[in-house]
Amino acid sequence: MAVTGNLSPQWLEEQYRIWKATPEQLSDDWQAFFEGFDLAHQAPTVDRDLAAKASAVDSLIYRYRDLGHLVACTDPLSPCKQDHPLLNLAVFGLDEGDLERTFYPLRYPQQSATLREILDLLRETYCSTIGVEFMHIQDPDQRQWLKDRMETVRNRPQLNEPDRLDILRTLQKATLFEAFLHKKFLGQKRFSLEGGEAMIPLLECLVVHATSLGVTDVVMGMAHRGRLNVLANIFQKPLENIFAEFKDNLELAFVGDGDVKYHKGSSVDRKIDGNGSIHLSLAANPSHLEAVDPVVIGKCRARHIGYGPGGRKRVLPLLVHGDAAFAGQGVIAEVLNLSQVDGYQSGGTFHLVLNNQIGFTTEPAHARSTLYATDVAKMLMIPVFHVNGEDPEAVVHATQLALEYRQQFARDVVVEVICYRRYGHNEGDEPAFTQPLMYERIRQRPPLHEIYAERLIKDGVDPSQIKALEQETADTLELALEAEPVNQRDVGFQAKWAKVQREYTPDQPKTAVDAERLRTLTDKMTSPPATFHVHPKIAKLLERRREAVSEGSGIDWGNAEALAFATLLTEQVPVRLSGQDCRRGTFNHRHAALVDQENAQLYFPLAFLEKGQAPIQVYNSILSEVAVLGFEYGYSMETPEGLNIWEAQFGDFANGAQVIIDQFISGSGTKWDRSSGLVMFLPHGYEGQGPEHSSARIERYLSLCAEHNMQVAQPSSPAQLFHLLRRQVKVPWRRPLIIFTPKSLLRLPACTSTLDELADGRFANILQGPGDAAEIQRLLLCTGKVYYDLLAAKQDAKRD
């Protein structure tokens, strides 16, 4: 169609009318032109109702993923919920007439499906015996990862008959063990697992599956409920020894005060068919619920570091919580907060919440302000799996999925098993006094292994095979009752602790360091790279430190501490310092990390002393005492060769971690045969900052001292601190060391040391002041700041 010149609109309109009436009057080119014109302007016909329903289906799918857990059948004591107002079809503008209509939903496992098929998948995945909270997770990759693995199998495990029989066998072992103890040792406390027996196949599944995923170490912390069952069936503690403890005739492997049988720790190397072996460790713990949690995390962190790259996938922290404690104990939030903090990451902790729906006699409404006991964990944006404790297969599936998530994303994960407690808080308690209706329902529930056996029989498993498995377990228990206890190996001082001496001896090892060596190290740690922009005041501080060592006098507290660290690091002793603001130091005296004033990059002078030195770790901690001190205590249990220090911001605040001090630091040796070389720095002194910033309560720590369980010191000079820190790793034994550190003395000109005192001296329990001993008429015993106050008063009074 050749067009020359401009065409008037009027002419085009006339041609268009002709084409509409008699198109054959126009040329083929103009006919094609007007056909294209009309086609381009025809609005597509859209079924608005169908589009609205398609959008509604997408919203419905999202809502089930988000809220399906609210109607999941997870409580074995309550009828299953049938519906929820927010999941009703009418809310989305859908009705029964749409059930057979085919939809093409977005972000769904199948390209197309009827609404009925979509609902079936969603209800089976999110509303059966597993309820999942995961849509709060902000990372879309994590959400998609979970959806892909849940919806494709409808949240059901793919188990063959041998797998199911293995689950049954573990249930039988768990239930029959408790029944046997109840019968043979009537009235004795054991804090039965009955009602929550699903925990045993869960743990067995976790151990086996973890091994296949590359885990070599599982470090576990748990309270008393079900602990004996776990020791017997997961840690393979000899049944003979457990029964002997009930008979009170088991000889301890060490001399000490001991502890009740459901507080003791254990360890075992378990062989796993086809996957090698895995080391299991159960941390000893007191009755203080959840206090062991940060200890376990610290132990795992130390093992991660020890293994090097890839260590986080090899070591799995496993914490077993009760529902009331998980919601009620503040240490839970503190431990969760450590999860992704630099220097404290655990690689993801597996949290198992055994929810028996009661805390001693307290019901959930009085135990928490949230719908779920686990709601505090959502602060980490992690998935929470709620599982019916009477569906062991669902428990196994949730465990496998949760563990795979942890290995994939290095994040914490929570599995809550909702169950019940068949007896009272302990076996001598009558729960019907306070929960009569609940315990009437519980009395009607058969044991879980019987429920699951019936399920297998319905699916075609031979009943005689099930009976044979049960008889095998019963025979094993009877034989163990009559057998002699197995000799216990000395578990407290093995492996990395084998070279550590259990008994305390009054050693005074050589802690002095050659003066020339001290000068060399000082030059290195006070000379940052030329390209590093040091704050002018810090540059002057480094210069003063260098001059003090060079001139041989005026070595202050921060300088002596840094020299103690430096000498140990170059002697292959790793050093870790942790606490609030400890990199700089609360009182601006340390500066273990320098900050470039132009780009904010960090430089750690102690990390660049010489090639091949031991590593230095200095971390500002979260604002917590109990979790961080517990973490560092656990870390120290794995590193007897290192110097591990926790510093309180002020010594007054250490009582926020009193449970760690009382139950672990002061008592672990005599109770559990466990040692620690942890050092606590507690700033102490009346410097006019009020009653909460003045006293670390020396008297409290002294009252905890007995039978050489720990050391308490208040060094009065920088040289004394230098020797005390070095002595801590030079002695052949390990005991916690509490050091009351100064405040004003950090810059007091009189409180300095000479180079000779570092190069020739050693730690002394008693220091003699200046003056002629023959002229002394009055003797004053004092320490720390008091000495310098008295010295100044003496000088002012011009008294000798």
Report residues per predicted region.
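Flexible, glycine-rich loop/tail regions that form catalytic "lids" or insertion modules at the edges
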Residues: 52-62, 69-103, 145, 153, ...
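Conserved phosphate-handling catalytic cores of large alpha/beta enzymes
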Residues: 359-370, 378-414, 418-424, 432
